[in-house]
């Protein structure tokens, strides 16, 4: 890979901290959106990269934040040259990444992990299904990138010899970027879904990890607090900046609180009858009843579960509807029988990211 003039001449600022968003940082339209960028997903990398957006400090090759997120991903993972080392130009050298396994620090670790994955899945594709963004080039761009990974395990990996199996599963990466550097990321690789599709028993892999934990695990209380509070507002946007009518922040926080901490009545009130859910460990289902059962299974295992919303941002407006990204965290004690085998009495930390669409409700639904 030949370094561009931008790469040769850029000055990087170390040790950035992610600033929380406010209501004014949310895009009120869809001019810069994945739907328009991909022409309603009819193309993956378009000829026209879309409207020019202020991107101070970013490589001028990128037109807007959607273009940046989609094309750096494609360049790293899928081009003929497969420029894995380009990660060093779009992740800060001291980047902080919270993932399935714990806390990863620095772009070199990301580069190493990516080489491992591309060797295990030489035909890998990372197909963007949605990108929700907010922010700007002063406070930072916050992006929630929903990607479907597709590939065939024809290479050796940390899970053993090549299995020859085809995989397809969702990944969500919530990033904060300034001046061409992603410096904070909360990413859920959905490792359990990948393992199941590869024919690897997730329980056996969990036992192996317990005896030989990877870097960043177990997660300390300090790291857990950092995971929850990084980029989070000290006070919810809906409390610090009240608005009349529908408020995506208030809606998302109320919905999560009701579903996970209370009686779950919001499922019937706000979810479509045939809504589609896809989540961790290859969970795929549709409809309110299936979702209610999923929530019941989790709460049965962790009867004292308490969930809190850490960050909400969104795109949209009342006429076109809303795209909402919500990052949450929860704590509970493994006290119940069920999907996680015999209760251990251990305190557990759970976190996740959720992307969903919401039409504007009627006044009588608020």
Model-derived regions: residue spans:
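Short, low-complexity N-terminal intrinsically disordered segments enriched in polar/charged residues
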Residues: 2-76, 81, 203-261, 269
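A solvent-exposed, acidic/Ser-Thr-rich amphipathic alpha-helical stretch
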Residues: 64-71, 82-151, 264-333
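Hydrophobic/aromatic beta-strand elements that line small-molecule binding cavities or substrate pockets
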Residues: 129-133, 170-175, 309-314, 351-356
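Short, cysteine-centered beta-strand-loop-beta hairpins and adjacent loop/turn segments enriched
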Residues: 150-165, 331-346
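Short, solvent-exposed aromatic-acidic interface loops
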Residues: 186-196, 362
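Single conserved hydrophobic/aromatic residue that forms the stacking wall/gate
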Residues: 356-359, 363-366
């Amino acid at each position: 890979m030949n370094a561009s003039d931008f790469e040769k001449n850029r000055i990087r600022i170390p040790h950035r901290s992610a600033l929380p968003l406010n209501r004014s940082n949310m895009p009120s339209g869809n001019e810069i959106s994945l739907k328009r960028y991909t022409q309603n997903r009819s193309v993956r990398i378009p000829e026209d990269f879309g409207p020019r957006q202020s991107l101070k400090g970013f490589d001028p090759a990128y037109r807007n934040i959607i273009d940046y997120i989609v094309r750096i991903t494609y360049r790293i993972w899928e081009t003929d040259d497969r420029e894995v080392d380009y990660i060093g130009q779009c992740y800060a050298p001291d980047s902080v990444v919270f993932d399935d396994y714990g806390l990863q620090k620095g772009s070199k670790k990301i580069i190493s992990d990516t080489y491992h994955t591309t060797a295990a899945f030489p035909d890998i594709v990372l197909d963007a299904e949605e990108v929700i963004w907010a922010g700007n080039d002063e406070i930072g761009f916050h992006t929630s990138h929903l990607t479907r990974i597709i590939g065939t395990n024809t290479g050796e990996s940390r899970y053993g010899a090549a299995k020859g199996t085809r995989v397809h599963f969702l990944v969500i990466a919530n990033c904060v970027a300034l001046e061409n550097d992603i410096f904070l990321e909360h990413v859920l690789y959905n490792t359990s879904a990948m393992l199941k599709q590869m024919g690897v028993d997730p329980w056996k892999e969990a036992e192996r990890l317990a005896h030989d934990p990877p870097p960043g695990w177990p997660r300390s209380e300090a790291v857990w607090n950092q995971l929850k509070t990084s980029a989070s507002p000290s006070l919810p946007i809906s409390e610090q900046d009240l608005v009349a009518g529908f408020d995506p922040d208030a809606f998302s926080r109320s919905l999560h609180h009701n579903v996970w901490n209370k009686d779950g009545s919001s499922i019937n009130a706000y979810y479509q009858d045939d809504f589609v859910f896809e989540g961790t460990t290859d969970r795929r289902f549709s409809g309110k009843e299936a979702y209610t059962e999923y929530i019941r299974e989790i709460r049965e295992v962790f009867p004292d579960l308490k969930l809190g919303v850490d960050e909400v941002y969104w795109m949209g407006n009342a006429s076109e509807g809303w795209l909402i990204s919500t990052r949450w965290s929860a704590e509970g004690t493994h006290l119940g029988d069920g999907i996680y085998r015999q209760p251990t009495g251990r305190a557990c930390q759970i976190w996740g990211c959720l992307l969903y669409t919401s039409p504007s409700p009627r006044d009588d639904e608020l």
